[in-house]
Amino acid sequence: HAIRQRLAALADDAQKVKHQAILAFLQTQLGLQALTRSENKTAVSHFQSAIELDAGAVPAYLNLGDVQRREGQLDEAIATWEQVIRIAPERAYLVFDRIEAVTREQGDAERFPALCRRLIEANQQDWRARLALGRHLATRGQPSEALDLLFDSLVHNPHALSIHQVVWQALAALRFNEARVQRYMELTREAVFYLDPHVCMRCRYRSTELLWQCPQCHEWNTFVEERITPAEESEDDSS
């Protein structure tokens, strides 16, 4: 951490941004270490320092919100997590379960669905927001409405196993309605299921989960979600 600070101090403006981003990740790790010692105030200080270094330090927001929630600061926790949606909408799914759980604790049945709908309106290809809202509705006795969202989600990403799991939950609740099952079969006839793989842009290391540091090349924040495109499917079919 000290070495990285010295490098940041000596770097030009372009390199300083990169060094500060790495320092932010290191500050977040220090915060997590403080949490293992039950030093919440120290952890919060590290997470806040990370955000000051890099306003896009997603892990710092996630962990800061988690501490705020544990300390009973529910409104503050939600506000912190919502910053993730603002600064990195492609990572919004990381706060879905958190926000849904806290708003449920608060007795607010509208805030989370409204959030998902805003994200869907802002990005028509956001399959994760549709999945989150579909799962929310399915667990609250609205399987038909859930399936509409889940089928839309499948159109954008028919290969994600997480969608199919909730679809079957909703179909079971509808006693496997023939028309709905037929629609599901049409959408998934060519699908190959996988569990949300991620790949490091630096060294191509593959992971089934989002990692903040690559275990192979050790670079920070290099993982992106790998998607199977129609072109790739066509190439696979012809080979």
Predicted features and spans:
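Residue at a conserved register position within TPR or TPR-like alpha-solenoid repeats
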Residues: 27, 34, 68, 102-103, ...
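Flexible helix-coil transition and linker loops at the boundaries of alpha-helical arrays
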Residues: 8-20
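Start-of-helix register in tetratricopeptide repeats
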Residues: 18, 25, 59, 93-94, ...
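Hydrophobic/aromatic packing residues within the alpha-helices of TPR/SEL1-like helical repeat arrays
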Residues: 4-7, 47, 81, 116, ...
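Short coil turns that delineate tetratricopeptide repeat
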Residues: 55, 89-90, 124, 158
